[in-house]
Amino acid sequence: MIRKEIVLPAARDEVWAALTDPRQLEEWFANDVELDLRPGGEARFSWGNGESRTAIVTEVEPEERLAFEWDEEGEVEFTLDDDVEGTRLTVVETSPAWTTALALQASALALA
């Protein structure tokens, strides 16, 4: 699991739009975005290097919480909270690949 929090100097509705509006996502995340913003909806992301990924939207609580399931590779959850400086965005990504990668790193460090 990876967890990251950042306080953004923007109102919650602006941060929500940056996470859910395909045109805004294309400005900072992927070159091409299609998003059916409802539980069970599909999200498709494509990048300029030819890579693409598909996710299924699992949770939508407008301006509060958004969650995706990446194929069968894991989940990512975005949570928005008010902060005196704007909006706190918390991103949590869980994936079996992270568990394996971190275990391998721990083993390598133990051997060093």
Feature roles, as predicted:
Residues 20-21, 30, 62, 107-111:
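Residues at helix-coil transition
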Residues 94-112:
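A conserved amphipathic terminal alpha-helix motif
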